[in-house]
Every structure is written in C-alpha cells, then in structure tokens.
Amino acid sequence: MARVCEVTGKKPMTGHHVSHANNKTKRRFLPNLQRRRFWVESERRWISLRLSNEALRTIDKNGIDAVLAEMRARRDSI
C-alpha cells in the first residue's frame, strides 16, 4: 500500500542524512499517516481513510462532509 494521504496527496520525500562529518546518505521523509474512521451522517455509514495529520486538522476545521465533497470533485474514490 502506498504511503499517500487520501485527502492532501502527501507522499514520501527524499533527502539526506547528514553526519557531523557532513557525509550524506539517502533517506526518505515519510508523511505522518494515520488510519481513521469517520461517521458520515449524510450517508449514514462509516468511512475509513488513511490521512496525514494535516488532513485530520483540515477535517476538524471544515468537517468531513466538506472534505468528502472536495475529494469527489477531484474524482477520488472513497
């Protein structure tokens, strides 16, 4: 399963570990993904999403119905 947020689309980034001697080795910066279930009152069902912490904050601010409407406008499957 890809490490991608279903709402924001955040993906892993690449970069370097940098030692004290300034040696650089490859590394990945992974998004802070959480699996959460939300009760959608308008549909009378639970929806399970894999979200970044930023997406959780967006849902807290705008509500799950607004976020789902935005995802459907982008034609994402839910």
From Swiss-Prot:
For this protein, the record's SUPFAM superfamilies field holds: L28p-like
Q: Which Gene Ontology molecular-function terms are recorded?
A: structural constituent of ribosome
Q: Which GO terms describe its biological process?
A: translation
Q: Supply one GO CC term from the record.
A: cytosolic large ribosomal subunit
What are the record keywords, sorted? Ribonucleoprotein, Ribosomal protein
User: Can you tell me where the transmembrane regions are?
Assistant: none
* Tagged with keyword Ribonucleoprotein: yes
Record-linked InterPro entries:
Ribosomal_bL28, Ribosomal_bL28/bL31-like_sf, Ribosomal_bL28_bact-type, Ribosomal_bL28_sf
Q: Which family does it belong to?
A: Belongs to the bacterial ribosomal protein bL28 family.
Q: Which NCBIfam families match?
A: L28
Listed name of the protein: Large ribosomal subunit protein bL28
Gene expressing this chain: rpmB
